[in-house]
Protein backbone atom coordinates (compact mmCIF):
# COMPACT_ATOMS: atom_id res chain seq x y z
CA UNK A 1 0.00 0.00 0.00
CA UNK A 2 1.41 3.44 -0.90
CA UNK A 3 2.33 5.79 1.92
CA UNK A 4 0.32 8.92 2.64
CA UNK A 5 2.35 11.81 1.26
CA UNK A 6 0.81 14.46 3.52
CA UNK A 7 1.99 12.79 6.75
CA UNK A 8 5.49 13.05 8.18
CA UNK A 9 7.28 10.35 10.21
CA UNK A 10 5.38 11.35 13.36
CA UNK A 11 1.99 11.31 11.65
CA UNK A 12 1.64 15.11 11.54
CA UNK A 13 0.01 16.64 8.47
CA UNK A 14 2.33 18.66 6.24
CA UNK A 15 2.22 20.20 2.79
CA UNK A 16 4.16 18.03 0.35
CA UNK A 17 7.38 19.63 -0.91
CA UNK A 18 7.11 19.78 -4.71
CA UNK A 19 10.05 22.16 -5.22
CA UNK A 20 12.21 19.47 -6.86
CA UNK A 21 9.48 18.20 -9.18
CA UNK A 22 9.62 19.24 -12.82
CA UNK A 23 6.43 20.76 -14.22
CA UNK A 24 4.56 18.31 -16.46
CA UNK A 25 1.22 18.35 -18.26
CA UNK A 26 -1.47 17.06 -15.91
CA UNK A 27 -5.22 16.67 -16.32
CA UNK A 28 -8.09 15.45 -14.18
CA UNK A 29 -11.76 14.79 -14.86
CA UNK A 30 -14.46 14.37 -12.21
CA UNK A 31 -18.21 13.90 -12.14
CA UNK A 32 -21.17 14.11 -9.81
CA UNK A 33 -24.95 14.32 -9.96
CA UNK A 34 -27.72 16.14 -8.20
CA UNK A 35 -30.95 14.16 -8.18
CA UNK A 36 -34.24 16.05 -7.91
CA UNK A 37 -37.95 15.87 -8.52
CA UNK A 38 -38.97 15.86 -12.20
CA UNK A 39 -40.80 19.17 -11.59
CA UNK A 40 -37.58 20.77 -10.33
CA UNK A 41 -35.68 19.60 -13.40
CA UNK A 42 -38.43 21.08 -15.56
CA UNK A 43 -38.05 24.45 -13.78
CA UNK A 44 -34.33 24.44 -14.52
CA UNK A 45 -34.68 23.35 -18.15
CA UNK A 46 -37.39 25.91 -18.90
CA UNK A 47 -35.49 28.74 -17.18
CA UNK A 48 -38.25 29.31 -14.62
CA UNK A 49 -36.13 29.18 -11.45
CA UNK A 50 -36.67 32.33 -9.38
CA UNK A 51 -32.93 32.87 -8.87
CA UNK A 52 -32.18 32.84 -12.61
CA UNK A 53 -29.93 30.75 -14.87
CA UNK A 54 -29.23 27.72 -12.69
CA UNK A 55 -26.91 25.82 -15.03
CA UNK A 56 -24.92 28.87 -16.12
CA UNK A 57 -24.44 29.97 -12.53
CA UNK A 58 -23.44 26.45 -11.44
CA UNK A 59 -20.92 26.24 -14.28
CA UNK A 60 -19.29 29.53 -13.29
CA UNK A 61 -19.32 28.57 -9.60
CA UNK A 62 -17.51 25.34 -10.44
CA UNK A 63 -14.86 27.19 -12.45
CA UNK A 64 -14.34 29.70 -9.64
CA UNK A 65 -14.12 26.90 -7.06
CA UNK A 66 -11.43 25.06 -9.03
CA UNK A 67 -9.34 28.25 -9.05
CA UNK A 68 -9.69 28.59 -5.26
CA UNK A 69 -9.23 24.96 -4.23
CA UNK A 70 -6.01 25.76 -2.36
CA UNK A 71 -8.03 28.13 -0.12
CA UNK A 72 -10.63 25.44 0.68
CA UNK A 73 -8.63 22.22 1.04
CA UNK A 74 -5.83 22.24 3.64
CA UNK A 75 -2.38 21.35 2.26
CA UNK A 76 -3.48 21.80 -1.37
CA UNK A 77 -0.93 23.71 -3.47
CA UNK A 78 -1.96 26.91 -5.27
CA UNK A 79 -1.68 26.18 -8.99
CA UNK A 80 -1.73 28.28 -12.13
CA UNK A 81 -4.51 26.40 -13.91
CA UNK A 82 -4.39 26.32 -17.70
CA UNK A 83 -7.97 25.14 -18.24
CA UNK A 84 -11.13 24.55 -16.25
CA UNK A 85 -14.23 23.29 -18.01
CA UNK A 86 -17.47 22.52 -16.18
CA UNK A 87 -20.47 21.00 -17.95
CA UNK A 88 -23.94 20.78 -16.40
CA UNK A 89 -26.24 18.49 -18.36
CA UNK A 90 -29.89 17.81 -17.52
CA UNK A 91 -30.53 14.07 -17.28
CA UNK A 92 -34.21 13.08 -17.21
CA UNK A 93 -33.24 9.50 -16.31
CA UNK A 94 -31.97 10.61 -12.88
CA UNK A 95 -33.98 12.95 -12.87
CA UNK A 96 -31.44 15.69 -12.24
CA UNK A 97 -28.24 17.30 -13.42
CA UNK A 98 -25.03 15.45 -14.32
CA UNK A 99 -21.99 17.66 -13.71
CA UNK A 100 -18.50 17.03 -15.08
CA UNK A 101 -15.29 19.01 -14.74
CA UNK A 102 -11.98 18.89 -16.56
CA UNK A 103 -8.93 20.70 -15.23
CA UNK A 104 -5.48 21.07 -16.83
CA UNK A 105 -2.19 22.42 -15.56
CA UNK A 106 1.48 22.44 -16.49
CA UNK A 107 2.85 22.01 -13.01
CA UNK A 108 4.56 19.95 -10.32
CA UNK A 109 1.42 18.39 -8.82
CA UNK A 110 -1.91 17.03 -10.00
CA UNK A 111 -5.29 18.71 -10.29
CA UNK A 112 -7.59 15.98 -8.97
CA UNK A 113 -8.72 18.12 -6.04
CA UNK A 114 -9.47 21.03 -8.35
CA UNK A 115 -11.70 18.86 -10.57
CA UNK A 116 -13.49 17.34 -7.56
CA UNK A 117 -13.96 20.77 -5.97
CA UNK A 118 -15.39 22.18 -9.21
CA UNK A 119 -17.99 19.39 -9.36
CA UNK A 120 -18.83 19.67 -5.66
CA UNK A 121 -19.41 23.43 -5.73
CA UNK A 122 -21.36 23.27 -8.99
CA UNK A 123 -23.68 20.68 -7.39
CA UNK A 124 -24.05 22.81 -4.26
CA UNK A 125 -24.88 25.83 -6.41
CA UNK A 126 -27.66 23.96 -8.19
CA UNK A 127 -29.03 22.97 -4.78
CA UNK A 128 -28.88 26.56 -3.52
CA UNK A 129 -30.62 27.98 -6.56
CA UNK A 130 -33.64 25.65 -6.50
CA UNK A 131 -33.87 24.55 -2.85
CA UNK A 132 -37.10 26.54 -2.43
CA UNK A 133 -38.72 24.17 -4.93
CA UNK A 134 -37.12 20.92 -3.74
CA UNK A 135 -35.32 20.55 -0.41
CA UNK A 136 -35.05 16.78 -0.91
CA UNK A 137 -32.45 16.96 -3.68
CA UNK A 138 -29.49 14.59 -3.29
CA UNK A 139 -25.90 15.20 -4.35
CA UNK A 140 -24.45 11.83 -5.34
CA UNK A 141 -21.55 10.04 -6.93
CA UNK A 142 -18.86 12.71 -6.81
CA UNK A 143 -15.74 10.93 -7.99
CA UNK A 144 -12.55 11.19 -9.98
CA UNK A 145 -13.05 9.80 -13.49
CA UNK A 146 -9.54 10.17 -14.84
CA UNK A 147 -6.17 11.72 -14.09
CA UNK A 148 -3.06 11.81 -16.19
CA UNK A 149 0.48 13.06 -15.86
CA UNK A 150 2.96 12.96 -13.06
CA UNK A 151 4.84 10.07 -11.52
CA UNK A 152 1.78 7.87 -10.99
CA UNK A 153 0.70 8.14 -14.64
CA UNK A 154 -2.81 7.43 -15.87
CA UNK A 155 -5.76 6.57 -13.64
CA UNK A 156 -9.18 5.74 -15.05
CA UNK A 157 -12.17 4.95 -12.84
CA UNK A 158 -14.24 1.85 -13.38
CA UNK A 159 -17.58 2.59 -15.07
CA UNK A 160 -20.32 3.39 -12.56
From Swiss-Prot:
User: Which UniProt key words apply to this protein?
Assistant: Lyase, Molybdenum cofactor biosynthesis
Task: Enumerate the Gene Ontology biological process terms.
Answer: Mo-molybdopterin cofactor biosynthetic process
Subunit structure, as described in the record: Homohexamer; trimer of dimers.
Matching Pfam families? MoaC
In its UniProt record, a GO molecular function of this protein is: cyclic pyranopterin monophosphate synthase activity
Family membership, please give it. Belongs to the MoaC family.
Q: Which reaction does it catalyse?
A: (8S)-3',8-cyclo-7,8-dihydroguanosine 5'-triphosphate = cyclic pyranopterin phosphate + diphosphate
Which pathway does it operate in? Cofactor biosynthesis; molybdopterin biosynthesis
Its EC number is 4.6.1.17
| First-tier enzyme category under EC | lyase
Instruction: Name the cystine pairs.
Output: none
Keyword Lyase part of the UniProt annotation:
yes
Active site residues of this protein: 128
SUPFAM superfamilies registered for this protein in UniProt: Molybdenum cofactor biosynthesis protein C, MoaC (SSF55040)
Binding residues for substrate:
75-77, 113-114
* Annotated protein name in UniProt: Cyclic pyranopterin monophosphate synthase
Q: Please explain the role this protein plays, according to its UniProt record.
A: Catalyzes the conversion of (8S)-3',8-cyclo-7,8-dihydroguanosine 5'-triphosphate to cyclic pyranopterin monophosphate (cPMP).
Q: HAMAP family per the record? A: MoaC_B
Amino acid sequence: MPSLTHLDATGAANMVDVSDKAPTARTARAEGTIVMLPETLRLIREGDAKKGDVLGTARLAGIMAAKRTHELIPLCHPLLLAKVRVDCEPDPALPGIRITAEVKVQGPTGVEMEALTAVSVACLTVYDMVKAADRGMRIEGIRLLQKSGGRSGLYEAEPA
